[in-house]
């Protein structure tokens, strides 16, 4: 039906007869001439109808936005004065000789001249995807997956599929369950990741595996998460953590070079402890120049419990954040930041405005200055390298609250004051995470997953002091987003059972849930390590959007619903009966 795409016509096509298929993007009726911007997935070209082709001109008068049409015509060069430098096809136009209206369009529920609500865009997603910016994002996503496949193939990785219907295993979120009709009362689980299957593939001898795979997690959603998402899943045998990072870094550098024309350079490597100490986050945005500075040792003897308490508590922390030029902040802005940190558990926000350092106490403005002598204030200013016109904010509480609150404040202030250089790319690796974290109920939970190997510890040493264990794990972070994470896996049965025991999984439960894995570990398991990238998040960064739904063709809302198909929906009673399922409605409280 077509000979060319609209958006691919150039001066080299001048004089050629072409047939185009697409949609009316815009129509301009000048009476004796009608111009339309005709659109397909590759872009837009101007088509015009003149009186010499009366039948085509008459039919063109009926055209409206989003009519699906076919046009045959001749490509012509535009006059110099009519060239549109803002269009890829702006040097040419098509003189139409024939027009076919394939399908007419009703009045559109989306308005191309105004900003539509996201609810409307998701309900009429098939129309939203016609917009050039949305089409370009999905084309970029397709390019990324193609680049990934070629890179992985070139590096000896095998694309191997793993099951979608599998067994529920604890991986940090709730599973989506699928009832079995054949096995009454039993359920499959949709995979949160192919984690165990890819480890089993290593045990099977496939030493380099990858897969671009759908994963499912029934968890509370955020703007950058979806209940179903796509991973670039990778596993290797006989490779160390630095070797895995080297190959995966090369992949990401390749993507940025091919898609953005940007050389990311070598990625710096930072430990979890350093990232938390300097930035209050295990996924720091290094485009922001501000850092947290520990000042607890300067405040242990002050008669101000807000500072002295955490300063003398081994589990406490007092950190300062110097904001260049922050002395210009108004009282209202400071109060807003004080309320902001309370979201993260902080009780408030102390500060020092540095107006003129040379004047000592008279050169600062601070509600806490009365609790601090001149010597302590000067020491704080020296340590933070404060200059005239700066603001110093303080966080004082337990270590987690200080990191969470001050880390979030750092990001917000950096954006509000334009301190974060959003023109830059700032990738890094974060390594050496704690293996376990407090579950809030007196027990421990795996910080990554229970198949991650500890770093430089035997099973006996791990059992004796699990709180000291460092995971042989690594995350890739770009501009404050965790785009991928992985680890060296446990390849020894004793170590795996020790980790299960620390997590409160008894031997009976181990056999029930992971018997197949424990059995496989008995038969010459190779050392193995891997990583998974979030394809959606990578695409989000590479296309310059901050909404992950913009890079998924048919995404869910934050309530895990599809507004277009109205999924989820009630099931047919007959189907439920065949599955031995009965829906019980809870009585509403009066």
UniProtKB/Swiss-Prot annotation:
Region annotation Aspartate: where it falls in the sequence: 195-198
Superkingdom of origin: Bacteria
Chief localization: cytoplasm
One annotated GO biological process: aspartyl-tRNA aminoacylation
Location of the protein in the cell: Cytoplasm
HAMAP family noted in UniProt: Asp_tRNA_synth_type1
PROSITE patterns: AA_TRNA_LIGASE_II
Keyword Aminoacyl-tRNA synthetase: yes
Catalytic activity of the protein: tRNA(Asp) + L-aspartate + ATP = L-aspartyl-tRNA(Asp) + AMP + diphosphate
GO cellular component annotations of the record: cytoplasm
A molecular function GO annotation: ATP binding
Gene name per UniProt: aspS
Protein name: Aspartate--tRNA ligase
Subunit architecture: Homodimer.
Family: Belongs to the class-II aminoacyl-tRNA synthetase family. Type 1 subfamily.
Binding site for L-aspartate: 171, 217, 448, 489
Entry function: Catalyzes the attachment of L-aspartate to tRNA(Asp) in a two-step reaction: L-aspartate is first activated by ATP to form Asp-AMP and then transferred to the acceptor end of tRNA(Asp).
Pfam families with a match to the protein in the record: GAD, tRNA-synt_2, tRNA_anti-codon
Keywords: Aminoacyl-tRNA synthetase, ATP-binding, Cytoplasm, Ligase, Nucleotide-binding, Protein biosynthesis
Highest classification ranks of the organism: Bacteria, Pseudomonadati, Pseudomonadota, Gammaproteobacteria, Enterobacterales
Keyword Ligase recorded: yes
């Amino acid at each position: 039906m077509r000979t060319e795409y609209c958006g691919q016509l150039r001066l080299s096509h001048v004089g050629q007869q072409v047939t185009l298929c697409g949609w009316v993007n815009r129509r301009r009726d000048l009476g004796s001439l009608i111009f339309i911007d005709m659109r397909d997935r590759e872009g837009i070209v101007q088509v015009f109808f003149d009186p010499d082709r009366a039948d085509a001109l008459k039919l063109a008068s009926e055209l409206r936005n989003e009519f699906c049409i076919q046009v045959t015509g001749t490509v012509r060069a535009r006059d110099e004065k009519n060239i549109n430098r803002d269009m890829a096809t702006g040097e040419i136009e098509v003189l139409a000789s024939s027009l076919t209206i394939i399908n007419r369009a009703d009045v559109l529920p989306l308005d191309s001249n105004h900003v539509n609500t996201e609810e409307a865009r998701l309900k009429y997603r098939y129309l939203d995807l016609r917009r050039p910016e949305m089409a370009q994002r999905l084309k970029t996503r397709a390019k990324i997956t193609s680049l990934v496949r070629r890179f992985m193939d070139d590096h000896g990785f095998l694309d191997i599929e793993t099951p979608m219907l599998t067994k529920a295993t604890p991986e940090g979120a709730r599973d989506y369950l699928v009832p079995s009709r054949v096995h009454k009362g039993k359920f499959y689980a949709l995979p949160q990741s192919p984690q165990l299957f890819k480890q089993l593939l290593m045990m099977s001898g496939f030493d380099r595996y990858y897969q671009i795979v759908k994963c499912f997690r029934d968890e509370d959603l955020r703007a950058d998460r979806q209940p179903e998402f796509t991973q670039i899943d990778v596993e290797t045998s006989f490779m160390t953590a630095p070797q895995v990072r080297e190959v995966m870094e090369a992949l990401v550098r390749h993507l940025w070079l091919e898609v953005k024309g940007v050389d990311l350079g070598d990625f710096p490597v930072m430990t979890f402890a350093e990232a938390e100490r300097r930035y209050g986050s295990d996924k720091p945005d290094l485009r922001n120049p501000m850092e947290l500075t520990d000042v607890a040792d300067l405040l242990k003897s002050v008669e101000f419990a807000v500072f002295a308490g955490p300063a003398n508590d081994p589990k406490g922390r007092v950190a300062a954040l110097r904001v260049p030029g922050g002395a210009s902040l108004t009282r209202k802005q400071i109060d807003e930041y004080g309320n902001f940190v309370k979201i993260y558990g902080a009780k408030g926000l102390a500060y020092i405005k540095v107006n003129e350092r040379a004047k000592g106490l008279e050169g600062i403005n601070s509600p806490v200055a009365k609790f601090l002598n001149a010597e302590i204030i000067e020491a704080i200013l020296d340590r933070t390298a404060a200059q005239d016109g700066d603001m110093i904010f303080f966080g004082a509480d337990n270590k987690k609250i200080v990191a969470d609150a001050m880390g979030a404040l750092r990001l917000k202030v950096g954006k509000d004051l334009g301190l974060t250089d959003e023109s830059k790319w700032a990738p890094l690796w974060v390594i050496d995470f704690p293996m376990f974290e407090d579950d809030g109920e007196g027990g421990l939970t795996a910080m990554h997953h229970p198949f991650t190997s500890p770093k430089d510890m035997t099973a006996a040493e791990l059992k004796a002091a699990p709180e000291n264990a460092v995971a042989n794990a690594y995350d890739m972070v770009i501009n404050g987003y965790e785009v991928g994470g992985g680890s060296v896996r446990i390849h020894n049965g004793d170590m795996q059972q020790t980790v299960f025991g620390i997590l409160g999984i008894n031997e009976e439960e181990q056999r029930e849930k992971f018997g197949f894995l424990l059995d496989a570990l008995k038969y010459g398991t190779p050392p193995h390590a891997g990583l998974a990238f979030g394809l959606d998040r990578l695409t989000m960064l590479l296309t310059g959007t901050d909404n992950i739904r913009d890079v998924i063709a048919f995404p869910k809302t934050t309530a895990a619903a599809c507004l277009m198909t109205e999924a989820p929906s009630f099931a047919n009673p007959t189907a439920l009966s065949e599955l031995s399922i009965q829906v019980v409605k809870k009585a509403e409280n009066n």
